[in-house]
């Protein structure tokens, strides 16, 4: 798997795939739309994004997270290795009348000068074979005291991403929380916290649903090392 596959991804997915990239997070499957919008709510909360916050997103893809953040008054900027992906992001920002800057950059090697208040890595790190390099880039994007938030599918992505890897040639790896925490410390981050995202789903008053809701924290404790989504927040020294 090469970086060129990441560069070519928007072309490789065809017309239907590009339409999804343009309309993300909204699609025909309401459950997927709900999942993505709930995740965005967690990003707002965990990074304390508000008007005037300077945010960069590494591996921004079509830029939907940064566009939604900009609607909150956030001063947002997105970076992605694919020029075509950046063009999609810029075009959507123009269509929506939103001011967001997008630039082509490799998240493993980008120097942003320690000027941002917050940095986001959402569903991006598993496309890199060198997460340590990406986290160093994230560290050097942040002012001292700035916060990084990363969301990753966990180690299971090595199995769930096989189809995409075989079809498009993209890198689809999964990293366990322990490795990511170690890499964060080595990059210079402190106050590393993990959060479990249950998306606060509604549940009925049927006994089986109530029992499942009560048992959920234990399940996250057991499965968190390799299966459930990873959310890590850290502070740059």
Predicted regions and their residues:
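Class I SAM-dependent methyltransferase SAM/SAH-binding core
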Residues: 64-108
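A short acidic, Gly/Pro-enriched loop at the edge of an enzyme's catalytic core
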Residues: 108-118
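Short alpha-helix
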Residues: 173-188
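A short glycine-rich, Lys/Arg-flanked "PGG" loop and its adjoining helix->strand segment in the class I
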Residues: 132-144
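Class I SAM-dependent methyltransferase "Motif I" SAM/SAH-binding loop
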Residues: 59-61
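Conserved class I S-adenosyl-L-methionine
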Residues: 1-48, 149-171
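A C-terminal cap/extension of S-adenosyl-L-methionine-dependent methyltransferases
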Residues: 96, 102, 112, 149, ...
């Amino acid at each position: 798997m090469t970086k060129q596959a990441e560069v070519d991804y928007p072309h490789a997915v065809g017309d239907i795939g590009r339409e999804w990239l343009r309309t993300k997070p909204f699609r025909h499957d309401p459950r997927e739309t709900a999942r993505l919008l709930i995740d965005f709510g967690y990003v707002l909360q965990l990074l304390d994004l508000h008007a005037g916050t300077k945010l960069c997103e590494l591996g921004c893809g079509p830029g939907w997270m940064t566009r939604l953040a900009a609607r909150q008054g956030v001063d947002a900027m997105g970076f992605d290795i694919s020029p075509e992906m950046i063009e999609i992001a810029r075009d959507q920002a123009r269509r929506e009348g939103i001011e967001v800057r997008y630039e082509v950059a490799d998240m493993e090697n980008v120097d942003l000068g320690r000027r941002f208040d917050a940095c986001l890595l959402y569903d991006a790190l598993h496309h890199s074979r060198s997460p340590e390099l990406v986290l160093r880039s994230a560290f050097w994007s942040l002012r001292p005291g700035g916060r990084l938030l990363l969301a990753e599918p966990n180690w299971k992505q090595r199995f769930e991403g096989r189809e995409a890897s075989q079809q498009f040639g993209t890198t689809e790896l999964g990293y366990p929380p322990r490795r990511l925490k170690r890499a964060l410390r080595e990059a210079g981050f402190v106050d590393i916290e993990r959060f479990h995202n249950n998306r606060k789903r509604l549940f009925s008053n049927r006994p089986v649903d109530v029992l499942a809701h009560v048992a959920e924290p234990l399940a996250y404790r057991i499965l968190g090392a390799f299966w459930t989504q990873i959310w890590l927040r850290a502070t740059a020294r």
